Amino acid sequence: SLIRLFGSDGQFQGAVQTDSQWIQGMGKAKDGKVYLAYYDQSGNVKLSQIDFDGKALGQTYDDFPNTNGNGGLCAGIENDLLVNTDTALYDYSLADQKTTEVLSWLDSDINGSYVTYAAATADGKILAVVNDWNTGETDLVKLTRTKASEVAQKSQITIGTLYTSQSLQAAAVAFNKQSN
């Protein structure tokens, strides 16, 4: 894959060649640097800093979550990067190369496969763009951390499968949203 670099004036500055065939995502971390998530030749997901001056990939980080193409990376909450996967939202630490789960999409009555972007606000709320492939509807969702004891109890469907289809997951989420 080829990453083209442009300056703040919009002028082409050069390119960075990667050995990856599939880029997972890219974004700016808390440190103001831009990072690239991608598959390496062994199929593992890696994270590398983009060195704009050297026109190369910089330091590489391991144990990065697979974003399954939902790869809009942005500044983290407590750590460096907020990382969206199809099951959860994570805060990733560059120093420790570890993730901390921020939330489970299903626990928030959201089909994580439909989340195309997520970010944190300055006051700690989570904003997510949710694009429902089945209905064509797109929502901007704002999530606020709430203690489990403060959440109204309701009936929910839990489905255990080896692989869950998107339509089955969407049906369970829809039921869970509407149940009392």
Q: Model-derived features: where do they sit?
A:
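Short, well-ordered beta-strand elements
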Residues: 153-165, 180
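Structural motif
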Residues: 2-4, 42-49, 86-93, 134-142
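A short beta-strand motif characteristic of beta-propeller blades
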Residues: 11-17, 56-64, 100-109
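Short loop/turn segments that connect beta-strands within beta-propeller blades
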Residues: 6-11, 51-55, 94-97
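Short alpha-helix C-terminal cap/hinge motif
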Residues: 171-180
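Repeated scaffold domains used in trafficking and secretory/extracellular systems
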Residues: 18-31, 65-78, 110-121
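Residue position within the beta-strands of beta-propeller blades
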Residues: 36-38, 83, 128
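Blade-level signature of beta-propeller repeat domains, shared across WD40, Kelch, NHL, RCC1
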Residues: 115-151
